[in-house]
UniProtKB/Swiss-Prot annotation:
Species per Swiss-Prot/TrEMBL record: Aspergillus novofumigatus (strain IBT 16806)
Pfam families: AflR
Role this protein plays: Transcriptional regulator; part of the gene cluster that mediates the biosynthesis of the tetrahydroxanthone dimer neosartorin, which exhibits antibacterial activity.
Gene transcribed to yield this protein: nsrA
InterPro entries found in the cross-reference section: AflR
Lineage, uppermost ranks: Eukaryota, Fungi, Dikarya, Ascomycota, Pezizomycotina
GO biological process, alphabetically ordered: aflatoxin biosynthetic process; regulation of DNA-templated transcription
Disordered, as annotated region: 1-59, 143-167, 195-217
Subcellular location, record wording: Nucleus
Biased composition (Low complexity): 18-27, 195-212
Residue ranges with Polar residues bias: 143-156
Protein's name according to its UniProt entry: Transcriptional regulator nsrA
Record field: compositional bias (Basic and acidic residues): 8-17
Amino acid sequence: MKRPGRKREKDNGHEGRSSSSGLSSSRNFESTALPGDVQHADLSLVPPDPTPSPRLSEPAESFHMDMFAGPLTPLDSFLSPGLSGMRDCLTELLATPINFSELGLIDPILSNFAQEQHEIACLFGSDGASTDPDLLSGQSQLEFNLSPRPSSSGDQSLAEGGPKCSDKSKCHAICGCMMRALNLINTLFSSRASSSTSSSSSGFPRDSASGSTPTRPDSLLEALLAENRESMEIVHTILKCECGEMTYLIPMLSIAVVKVLERYALTARELAGDLGLDGKYKDPDRPFNSSVDDDHSSGRTTAQLILNELHRVQGAVNLVERLLKEDSLEDCVRRGQQCPVSSSPVAFSPTTVHQMNTDLRRRLTTLSSEIINILRQS
């Protein structure tokens, strides 16, 4: 005897079929139901047979995206009706033009933005030329930057005579005193003139023939004197400039003057050692020796040349002292008061600058005394 439930279980096992197959299985269930209690079952358990809804009538495969679709397949075919409607609303919102006058009602700050001109065409005239004053000022600035620079002869004249500037804060950009001072210090500390003079056997020439007149100093001494002379001329030119960088330049130039004095002092001490003086006066009872007297005559000439060059160093020291007095730096240091700070950047304290000036004058006085002593003993 066949059981009617077998057919129902078989029909309900196919879940992947469409909804129409499911409805047909329900009809078969009604026709094959057993009489008796099964037929008197509650009719509410039997699914009704109304007109199927659109969602249930769609095939099940429409709810799944084809993973093997081509890359050019439009995405709209996979969107549900709800997502498609949201996309249409977003597109309409972005395509709507913005009314800036309405933004002013929301925020007062945005009202100013609505009144301004935001079109590029209004910045240009009919011929395509710019009419914006900001652009015109930028164009004139560009023409100024591309203007030809002064010739080298003009720069040389500024370097030689020193510029006269009404605005001291801008003068240093024209004269270049800071760069010249740095180059001077580099030249003095890297030059081999002093070392070449010290390595020579004598700072002055010796004549082989006895009784001959002293000749000119040798080439090494001439090179030393010429280089020191040129260095002191640069120092004088920078000190006479009216730029606003003197608080930096005075200490740097003081270092340069110290280096020049050191060269002169080294030559003078070598001269005294070669003459055998060692700070002592010449013995008048010493027997006459023509060669020794010739050496003393040549040494006297060299000492006189060095002494004549010291007036340049004396002038530079006087200029530095005058500049310090003009700024009232030296007076406040002597009184022990707090010195005023100038408007320009101060590289060293006034006390340090005053001490450097005092050291310069002491070195100059000591060197002058040594050379005068050589002249007296020779």
